From Swiss-Prot:
Family statement drawn from the similarity comment of this UniProt entry: Belongs to the RNR ribonuclease family. DIS3L2 subfamily.
Species this protein is from: Arabidopsis thaliana
Thylakoid is among the record's keywords: no
Protein name from the UniProt record: Inactive exonuclease DIS3L2
Residue stretches of biased makeup (Basic and acidic residues): 39-59
UniProt GO MF annotations: 3'-5'-RNA exonuclease activity; metal ion binding; RNA binding
Biological classification of the source: Eukaryota, Viridiplantae, Streptophyta, Embryophyta, Tracheophyta
GO biological process terms held by the UniProt record: nuclear-transcribed mRNA catabolic process; polyuridylation-dependent mRNA catabolic process
Biased composition (Basic residues): 17-32
Binding, Mg(2+): D488, D497
Stretches that traverse the bilayer: none
PROSITE patterns, alphabetized: RIBONUCLEASE_II
Annotated localization: Cytoplasm
Functional summary from the UniProt entry: Probable inactive 3'-5'-exoribonuclease. Is unable to complement the growth defect of a yeast mutant lacking RRP44 exonuclease.
Region (Disordered): 1-109, 229-249
Length: 1055
C-alpha cells in the first residue's frame, strides 16, 4: 500500500503569442500533403469498450470556403478560453488502439506568413471571437489559404535525422499560452522553444515530432538565466567575464530525466522571448558554423553531442525551431474533453433572420466549436454531419443548456488550410458543474479503464472460502507463529505488506517485510495477467478505488487480512543497532497477521499513549497480546529511525510539503479541507519498504543482468538547479548542489533557521523540486553498458525497484517473478552441484552473491530454466512493459491531481469565497504569483489594465504599490472590472461579519473561523517578494467553462 514518496513532474510553463499578416489569395489550388506514417508501438487491445468507429466525412470543399477564418482572426482563435494550471503531461498511452483519421477539410495551397510575439498577456486570450457570433461571420467570408507548410515525407525525415539536420522530440505545450511549445530531445539538457502556431505545424500536446532548429542568430535570450557568478555568494572576486568564459569552454552538460517522488503541485516557469527578439547588431555565428567548429575540436560526434556543445557555449540562449513532421500522434488526441460553444453559434444564427428559424435546419456545411478544458489543446471544429443525433436535435431546438454539457471528442483531421483541427464527439458526460461527470471525464481523458473485469480474467481466480493448499504448506517456510502486523490507512482494504521484528542475542534484531504473493495467483500469459498488465496500476480517487486486480484477489485471498493464512514473499534481515544488515533470507512463506493497525493506531503506540487496546481498537488474532504488538511497533519505530538517519547520512534527499485532506459528508460530497502532514508511523513503514525494494533490486539485477525491471532517477536539471542556487544566494542562503546529500544538508540548515516560518519552508521546497523530474521504470538490458545510469538520485542508492505493492502495481508482479526465478535457480543449482541446501540457497539471493556460480555452466542453465518457468520476460518485451507502466503510472497520478483540483473547486464553489493568507513568490509589473499554504497551490493575480486600480511597479526596489483610483482613466483602451483582481469589502461589512462570527462561535461555524482568521488589507498596499497578503479564492468555470481556482486580492475600502 505504500511507496517511498509521491512522484512530481515539473513542467516548463512559458508564454507566447502570434502576429500575422494577410497574404494575397491564391484561388483554385489544392496542396499535396506529405504524410508521415505513425510509428505504432506494441499495444494491447483496449478493454474500456470505447467505440473506435469513425463517421466518414464527405468532401467539404464548399464548407471550407464558407467557414475557414482569415488570418487576421487567428491570434484570438488560437488561444484557449481560460488559462489554468493543468496536470503534468503524459506521454501517449501505447496500450490503446490507434484510430485512423478521415479528412474533413480540404487544404488549399497558399503561402504562410505568421510570426509570433513573445509572451503576451495570457489574459488577452481568455475571450476570443470563438465565443460569440463574430467568428462565424468572419469564417463565412474567409478565403481558402494554406496556413501551414506540408509535413516532410518519410524519406526526407529519415535522411534529415541521419545527417543530423533534424531531431526527433517530444512535443509539449505551455498551459498558460498555447502558442508556446517546447520539445524535449533525448540527450539534450535544454528544451527547444517552438514559438507560434505556424512553427508548431499542427502538432498536438504529447505528439512525437521531428523539428529543425533555427539559426543561432535567431535564438532569444533565455529569461531567468543565471550565470555562475550570480550563483556564487556575495564577496567573490571572480568577475562575470571570467565566469562567462568558463561557461563557453564547457562542451557538455549532464542529461537528467526524473525525480522519484515529489510533493509539489506547482510548475516552474522559464519564458523565452520569441524567435526575432534575440537578434542584436552583433549577432552570434550561425548554427551550422558553430556545429562545424565544435566538430573540428571534438572530432567525430553525433548531432546531439554537437547541439549540447553549442548550448554549453551559449548557456544564455534559448534554442528555437519548427516542427517539420509529426511521426507519432499522441493518443490524447482521441480523448479531448471540453464544452461546445453553443451560445456563440446561436448568436451567429440569430444575427441573420434568414438563418434564424425554430427549429433550425442544420446544414452539413456548418459546424460548432468545441472549447477544450485543457488549455494546451487548440479549439476544435465539429462539423454538424458528424454530430451525434441527440446533440444535433438539441442544437436544432436552440437548447442553451447544451453548452453546460461536458463532452469528449477525438481529432480526425487537421489540414494545411485549417486553423483548427476537425473533430467528432465520442462521449457525453453530463453537466460540467457536477462531480460525477467531471470524474468520469478525468478517467476518460487519461484512458483509465473503469469497466468490469472480463469473464476470462475471473476464471483463474480461486473459489472462496479459500485455504492454503497443502503442497504450498510443504514448500514454503511457515511463519504463522510470528507476530506479524499490518499498518495501513484506516480505509485500506488491499493489504499487501506486513511487518515483524524479533530480538536476537547480542543486541541484534531480525526484521521481516512480508509482501502478498500475488504472482502465485497471477500466472504469466493468462487472461488475468493480460488484464493486470493492461490496467498496470490501481487508481485511487477520494471515495473509491479502481483496482488493477479483481476485488476477490486484491481484497480477499491476496490481501494480508488479519487472522487469515496468507501466501507471502518475505525478506528477513538481521540488523545490528547501527542499522547495518548482517545477514538476510529471502523466500516464499505462509503468514498470519495478528492485527490491522491504522497509522493513527501505530502513532499512538509510538507516542506511548495508554489504554491502546480500548476505544475502538482493532481485534487481535491468534495467541498474541497487546503487549506483543506495542513492543513490536516500538522496536520497529526505533530501528526505522536508525535506518532513516543512516540513509540521509549517505546522501538521500527528502522534499516534502504538507497537503490538504478533504472532509466528506455522508453522501460522499466534499465540504471542507484540513491541512495534514505525515506522521512518524508513515516514516516507519516507508523505511522498511525502501529497504525491501533496494534488496529486491540488488538480487534480480545480479541474477538477471539483461532482463530486470528497475527504477532509475538521474540527476536533476543542471541549469534549473543552478538557478535555484542563484536564487538562494541572492537571498542570503548558502546552498550546495554538488550532490543529493549536500543539497539535503544545505536545505536542512536553511530550514532550521526558518523553523518559525513553515510557509517559507514550503516555498523553498517547491523551488527545490522544480529542477527534479519523474523517475521511471527501465529494463536493465537497455542500459547494460551504462550501469552508472541505473542509480536513484533522490534515494542516493545504485539500485532500486518496486517490490512491495503487487496488489496495485504490475511492475511489482514482474519483480516477484524474477525473484521467484532466482530462488528456483538456487534450488536447481544446488541439486546439480550436489551441495548443501543452505550453501546452495544463498548463492543468488543471499547477502553475498556468488558470481562464479552464476557464470558457471550449471548456474546459467539453472537461471535460464527458472526464468522460463516463472515468465521472466526478454529484454525487448520488458522494455515495452516498462514504457507502458511509466505511462500508466503517470496517468494515474494525473487523475489523482485532477481529482484534488476538482474537489478543491467544489468546496470553494460551496463556500463562494475563501479568505486566506498567501505568500508572494513572484512579482512584476503585470502580475504576481502567490503561494497558498492551506491548499499547497500557486496562483497568479493580474493587476494591470484593471479599471479603478493603480499598480505602480518600482523596478529599482522590486516593490509594487497597489492603490485605488478615485476617478476614471482617461484615454482609450480596454480595462477589466476591478472585481477580477480585487475582492473589495467595506470596513462596516467586516465588523458586522466579525460580530456575527462571535455570536455563533460556539456552533463552530466554518464561516466564522475563516472570517476570524484573515482580515482584508487596505489601500495603498505595498508588496514585495515574500510578502504575506490576504487573498480570496473562488471557483471558476463549471457550466460555462473549464474548472479553475481563481485568486484575488482581499481589500477593504469605504469608497
Amino acid at each position: 500500500m505504500k511507496s517511498a514518496s509521491s512522484e512530481q513532474s515539473v513542467e516548463r510553463i512559458e508564454n507566447g503569442h502570434k502576429k500575422k499578416r494577410n497574404r494575397p489569395q491564391k484561388q483554385n489550388r489544392r496542396s499535396k500533403q506529405s504524410s508521415v506514417p505513425i510509428e505504432d508501438a506494441h499495444v494491447e487491445e483496449s478493454l474500456d469498450g470505447r467505440d473506435s468507429s469513425r463517421s466518414k466525412a464527405k468532401d467539404s470543399t464548399s464548407s471550407s470556403k464558407q467557414q475557414r477564418p482569415n488570418t487576421d482572426e487567428l491570434e484570438a482563435m488560437r488561444a484557449s478560453n481560460v488559462a489554468f494550471n493543468s496536470m503534468p503531461p503524459m506521454r501517449a498511452e501505447s496500450g490503446y488502439p490507434r484510430r485512423s483519421a478521415s479528412p474533413l477539410l480540404s487544404s488549399p495551397e497558399v503561402s504562410k506568413q505568421l510570426l509570433s510575439k513573445s509572451c503576451p498577456d495570457p489574459r488577452a486570450c481568455e475571450q476570443s471571437p470563438g465565443m460569440n457570433g463574430e467568428l462565424f461571420q468572419q469564417i463565412e467570408g474567409s478565403s481558402q489559404r494554406k496556413i501551414f507548410s506540408s509535413h516532410w515525407s518519410l524519406d526526407a525525415v529519415t535522411e534529415a535525422l541521419e545527417k543530423g539536420e533534424a531531431f526527433k522530440a517530444l512535443f509539449r505545450v505551455n498551459a498558460h499560452n498555447r502558442n508556446e511549445a517546447y520539445c524535449k530531445i533525448d540527450g539534450v539538457p535544454t528544451d527547444i522553444l517552438i514559438n507560434g502556431n505556424v512553427c508548431q505545424s499542427r502538432a498536438v500536446e504529447g505528439d512525437t515530432v521531428v523539428i529543425k532548429l533555427d539559426p543561432l542568430s535567431l535564438w532569444p535570450k533565455m529569461k531567468g538565466f543565471v550565470t555562475e557568478s550570480a550563483a556564487k555568494p556575495e564577496g567573490t572576486n571572480s568577475p562575470p567575464e571570467k565566469d562567462d568564459k568558463k561557461a563557453r569552454q564547457k562542451n557538455g552538460i549532464d542529461v537528467v530525466e526524473g525525480f522519484e517522488d515529489g510533493f509539489s503541485k506547482n510548475k516552474s516557469s522559464v519564458i523565452g522571448k520569441g524567435a526575432k527578439n534575440g537578434v542584436t547588431p552583433s549577432s552570434p555565428p550561425s548554427l551550422d558554423s558553430c556545429l562545424g567548429s565544435f566538430c573540428e575540436q571534438k572530432g567525430n560526434c553525433s548531432a546531439v553531442d554537437k547541439l549540447c556543445g553549442i548550448l554549453s557555449s551559449f548557456p544564455h540562449k534559448r534554442p528555437t525551431g519548427q516542427v517539420v513532421a509529426v511521426v507519432e500522434k499522441s493518443l490524447v488526441r482521441d480523448s479531448i474533453v471540453g464544452l461546445l460553444d453553443v451560445k456563440g453559434w446561436i448568436h451567429y444564427k440569430e444575427s441573420d433572420p434568414k438563418r434564424c428559424k425554430s427549429p433550425l435546419s442544420l446544414s452539413d456545411d456548418e459546424y460548432v466549436q468545441l472549447m477544450p478544458a485543457d488549455p494546451r489543446f487548440p479549439k476544435l471544429i465539429v462539423p454538424f454531419h458528424v454530430l451525434p443525433g441527440s446533440i444535433r436535435a438539441r442544437l436544432e431546438n436552440l437548447d442553451p443548456n447544451l453548452e453546460a454539457e461536458l463532452v469528449a471528442a477525438q481529432i480526425v483531421d487537421w489540414g494545411e488550410g485549417s486553423p483548427f483541427p476537425v473533430a467528432q464527439i465520442t462521449h457525453l458526460f453530463g453537466r460540467g458543474s457536477e462531480l460525477e461527470p467531471q470524474i468520469n471525464a478525468i478517467l476518460y481523458q487519461n484512458s483509465v479503464c473503469d469497466s468490469d473485469f472480463s469473464p476470462g480474467s475471473l476464471t483463474s481466480l480461486p473459489r472462496v472460502p479459500w485455504e492454503v493448499p497443502e503442497e504450498e504448506v510443504q514448500r514454503r517456510k511457515d511463519l504463522r507463529d510470528l507476530c506479524v502486523l499490518t499498518i495501513d490507512p484506516s480505509t485500506a482494504t488491499d493489504l499487501d505488506d506486513a511487518l515483524s521484528v524479533q530480538s536476537l542475542p547480542g543486541g541484534f534484531f531480525r526484521v521481516g517485510v512480508h509482501i502478498a504473493d500475488v504472482s502465485y495467483f497471477v500466472l504469466p500469459e493468462t487472461a488475468l495477467d493480460t488484464e493486470a498488465r493492461f490496467r498496470s496500476t490501481s487508481v485511487y480517487l477520494m471515495q473509491r478505488k479502481i483496482s488493477m486486480l479483481p476485488p476477490l484477489l486484491s481484497e480477499n485471498v491476496g490481501s494480508l487480512s488479519p487472522g487469515a493464512d496468507r501466501l507471502a514473499f518475505s525478506i528477513l534481515w538481521d540488523l545490528n543497532r547501527e542499522g547495518d544488515v548482517i545477514d538476510r533470507w529471502i523466500g516464499r512463506t505462509i503468514i498470519r497477521s495478528c492485527c490491522k493497525l491504522s497509522y493513527d493506531h501505530a502513532q499512538d503506540i509510538i507516542d506511548g499513549k495508554s489504554d491502546v487496546a480500548e476505544n475502538g481498537w482493532p481485534a487481535l488474532h491468534g495467541s498474541f497480546k497487546w503487549c506483543d504488538v506495542t513492543r513490536s511497533v516500538k522496536q520497529l519505530s526505533e530501528i526505522s529511525t536508525t535506518l532513516r538517519q543512516k540513509r540521509f547520512r549517505n546522501g538521500a534527499l527528502q522534499l516534502e510539503n504538507s497537503k490538504p485532506v478533504f472532509l466528506f459528508d455522508e453522501h460522499g460530497v466534499p465540504y471542507d479541507f484540513v491541512t495534514c502532514s505525515r506522521k512518524g508511523s508513515n516514516f516507519l513503514v516507508e523505511e522498511f519498504m525502501l529497504l525491501a525494494n533496494m534488496t529486491a533490486a540488488e538480487v534480480i539485477s545480479q541474477a538477471y543482468r539483461a532482463s530486470s525491471l528497475l527504477r532509475r532517477h538521474p540527476e536533476p536539471n543542471t541549469r534549473k538547479l543552478k538557478e535555484f542556487e542563484g536564487f538562494c544566494s541572492k537571498h542570503g542562503m548558502d546552498l550546495d548542489i554538488s550532490s543529493s546529500g549536500q543539497l539535503q544538508d544545505s536545505l536542512e540548515k536553511i530550514t532550521g533557521n526558518l523553523k518559525d516560518d513553515s510557509v517559507f519552508v514550503d516555498i523553498l521546497n517547491n523551488y527545490a523540486i522544480k529542477p527534479m523530474q519523474l523517475a521511471s521504470y527501465f529494463c536493465t538490458g537497455n542500459l547494460k553498458d551504462s550501469v552508472a545510469e541505473w542509480g536513484h538520485y533522490a534515494l542516493a542508492v545504485p539500485l532500486y525497484t518496486h517490490f512491495t505493492s503487487p496488489l496495485r502495481r504490475y511492475p511489482d508482479i514482474v519483480v516477484h517473478r524474477a525473484l521467484a526465478a532466482a530462488l528456483e535457480a538456487e534450488e536447481l543449482y544446488s541439486k546439480q552441484k550436489q551441495t548443501a541446501i543452505d550453501e546452495g540457497r544463498s548463492c543468488f539471493t543471499g547477502i553475498h552473491f556468488n558470481k562464479d556460480a552464476a557464470e558457471s555452466i550449471e548456474g546459467k542453465e539453472a537461471l535460464s530454466v527458472a526464468a522460463l518457468k516463472h515468465g521472466v520476460p526478454s529484454t525487448e518485451i520488458l522494455s515495452d512493459v516498462a514504457a507502458y507502466c511509466n505511462e500508466r503510472k503517470l496517468a494515474a497520478r494525473k487523475v489523482r491531481d485532477a481529482c484534488d483540483k476538482l474537489y478543491t473547486w467544489f468546496v470553494l464553489k460551496q463556500k463562494e469565497i475563501f479568505p486566506c493568507e498567501a505568500r508572494v513568490m513572484n512579482l512584476g509589473s503585470r502580475f504576481m504569483t502567490v503561494y497558498i499554504s492551506k491548499l499547497g497551490i500557486e496562483r497568479r493575480i493580474y493587476y494591470d489594465q484593471i479599471e479603478g486600480l493603480c499598480a505602480d511597479w518600482l523596478e529599482a526596489t522590486s516593490t509594487l504599490i497597489v492603490d485605488k483610483l478615485y476617478s476614471k482613466r482617461g484615454g482609450r483602451g480596454f480595462f477589466k472590472p476591478m472585481k477580477e483582481a480585487v475582492y473589495l469589502v467595506s470596513p462596516c461589512e467586516v465588523c458586522v461579519a466579525k460580530c456575527s462570527a462571535l455570536s455563533v462561535h460556539d456552533t463552530e461555524s466554518p464561516e466564522a473561523v475563516s472570517i476570524d482568521e484573515v482580515a482584508p488589507a487596505v489601500f495603498p498596499l505595498t508588496i514585495q517578494l515574500f510578502s504575506t497578503i490576504p487573498v480570496v479564492l473562488h471557483a471558476v468555470g463549471g457550466d460555462d467553462g473549464p474548472l479553475d481556482i481563481g485568486a484575488r486580492l482581499y481589500m477593504s475600502s469605504y469608497y
